[in-house]
């Protein structure tokens, strides 16, 4: 075990601590003087208050015992862990391929249907499905198991790509995209929970970041995919994924089933087992046990609440997306009805969650958790800002630059490349400093500046390749804020609440993405066509304007770079995208504030900062920073500094 002075020598340098601070160590096994005992008693009381409504369930203890057996059972246990890591890498490789190219396919497909302005509806529907499916998939694994849930995810994933590839209209394409969104949701949830189960806080961000490293390879592969399939063969590109996904996901499924079998032979529970087995030590066998349990699981997942929430957001956000292009616009009775009914259902959802829900989507103990609320606010506004900017970003670059499809795809992936590089680096900084808060604040500030760099002084989006590239890189460095919010929220709850926090964070941050897509779509549909009328030559026919407004494919392939219509359209794009970037800039200011309000948890060998037990369930030593008392009333700077470094 590292001594307290060794543990803090690097963290002090990173967090800017002065010599007036001293460090003590809490330990159940070490002897202490009376002063240290008083501090230990205080810390224990804090932890007890934080977990007063939570008890260590039998299944959680069995998972920790199985983890211990894997680590200590020699070559066979280590081999199984290595295979699990390799299979997860393949799974995330598949996920990275999907994430890296489908935004481009969405833009081209909507243009092929002459409905490019409705791209926001595609992304909004996908985001809503991803959001509400997280709690559903979490509870599905409670009555089946993780590998069985993977199978369900895989089937829906493949069907979604097949439907999208064969679609003959935007409505069918949205259905297919919604199916694939369900699949992405499952991969997100299961990989995050597995990393949370197996890693201590000091390594959590690093291994979470490693899940994203396949993007470092797939970004360049996606460039070749784009070159081969965009703009005319996008259907074949989607069909390719329907074949590829089963091949890449199967190893993870078999590995988790193998872990279940090994655990059964040892009389234990693995992280691949069902949630009921992992939490309560209950093994569910046979249809007679599944069916009676389905009702209680529906209550536990708050199925009614999820349906109300999903329906409310779908009606409200899709109305905002579809109204500008509908007959009569906002005077269309259908759009007004969708909006009114959506808000009524949203009110019913709030009332149901507050008064009637037996198990609310967000438990009260989570809602009163300061660290979780701050992390959630950071994540929500981060996602909203990113989705607002990203909705038409690939379309913007596609039109304003005379680049090949390969260069276009690689440039769009620059932010992802930076994010995937900075996430593991940020994780290593967490490990070296044992803190996450200052890096989280730095990431939020860099991301805010990144949005600003993309704007010209006249409120237009820049055309400068250098500034666009710098903006892409700076936005990728916002990964430090993302991993900070993830680690901070997970550290703030005991082990058995880990999956709840991950699901709830994913639910609301993904809902925020759908709101961001809707904001961008509303701006685009309200401004773009009017700006095209103003910027294109006066002699340009209205039919031509509507055609290039509805299809980036037509604008890119039918009009030369020097064509006055193309130049006018580019100016219209810079004006519209400038407004979108300005909105993203405002939204990105919120994470800076709430990152500063996060607790400054010590990241050590503990699985969480509430019980301070490791992944094997054993108590760990946790160094903590104690401020020396000041003479007289502390200054404003001292109070601010004390609040910033506060660990609870």
UniProtKB/Swiss-Prot annotation:
Annotated compartments:
Cell membrane
| UniProt keywords, alphabetically | Cell membrane, Membrane, Transmembrane, Transmembrane helix
Q: Which GO terms describe its cellular component?
A: plasma membrane
Record keyword Cell membrane present: yes
Q: Which family does it belong to?
A: Belongs to the major facilitator superfamily.
Q: What does the UniProt record say this protein does? A: Siderophore transporter; part of the gene cluster 14 that mediates the biosynthesis of a ferrichrome A-like siderophors which may contribute to organismal virulence.
Q: Where is the composition biased (Basic and acidic residues)?
A: 1-11, 29-46
Q: Name one GO molecular function term.
A: transmembrane transporter activity
Region labeled Disordered — which residues?
Answer: 1-58
Give the transmembrane region(s).
79-99, 151-171, 205-225, 236-256, 303-323, 336-356, 409-429, 438-458, 468-488, 500-520, 578-598
Can you say what this protein is called? Siderophore transporter MYCGRDRAFT_70577
User: In which organism is this protein found?
Assistant: Zymoseptoria tritici (strain CBS 115943 / IPO323)
Where does the source fall among the domains of life? Eukaryota
Where does this protein have compositionally biased stretches of type Polar residues? 47-58
Q: How does it sit in the membrane?
A: Multi-pass membrane protein
* InterPro entries in UniProt: MFS_trans_sf
